[in-house]
Design a protein with these regions (language model features):
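Extracellular/luminal ectodomains and secreted, surface-exposed scaffolds of diverse proteins
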Residues: 106-146
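Generic alpha-helical propensity signal that fires on short helical segments
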Residues: 55-57, 88-90, 119-121, 126, ...
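Low-complexity, intrinsically disordered segments enriched in Ser/Thr together with acidic residues
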Residues: 147-156
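Catalytic core of carbohydrate-active enzymes
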Residues: 1, 6-99, 103-106, 111, ...
Length: 156
């Protein structure tokens, strides 16, 4: 069993692992349209959500003629704080192979798909991407800083 075929990280109960990577499976819309999602987070074990103790993170994937623009907006909310540093892993399903990936305009390093998730739970500094032509998945790994991020995936 290779790392690429490994099972996802599972937890038996809330807070078993207070900090863990978040994986987003993204199926982009047709050209000129968007796929959008809002990540909702709260304590998970109390009624704080009734007191507006939560945060939301809007995520939008825009399909362009030459690639995808993935926008992760800054966390919005109050009363809840993410318990520590963690990674975000985006898996974008695409029929086209990417040429390059940039984060905030800066080109990021490409790695092999089987190496992308190495030390994913502990190394919260690495920013890399990979292309798996067998599955048609472009994966982008980056630390969750809680702020605005713009990821551009350009086609060949």
């Amino acid at each position: 069993l290779s790392l690429h075929d490994a099972l996802p990280i599972l937890m038996n109960y809330t807070h078993e692992k207070p900090v863990y990577p978040l994986t987003f499976e993204i199926f982009p819309a047709q050209e000129g349209a968007q796929a959008a999602f809002t990540l909702y987070e709260d304590e998970g074990e109390d009624l704080g959500y009734q007191r507006d103790e939560f945060v939301k993170t809007p995520i939008i994937c825009s399909t362009l003629a030459n690639g995808y623009e993935l926008t992760v907006s800054a966390r919005e909310g109050k009363g809840y704080t993410v318990p520590g540093p963690r990674n975000l892993l985006f898996r974008i399903y695409s029929a086209k192979a990417p040429k390059e990936v940039t984060v905030k305009g800066k080109k990021i390093k490409k790695t092999k798909p089987e190496r992308l998730e190495e030390n994913l739970e502990n190394d919260t500094e690495t920013v890399v991407w990979s292309w798996d032509k067998e599955t048609g998945v472009c994966s982008v790994r980056m630390p969750d800083k809680g702020g605005n991020e713009q990821i551009m995936i350009a086609f060949k």
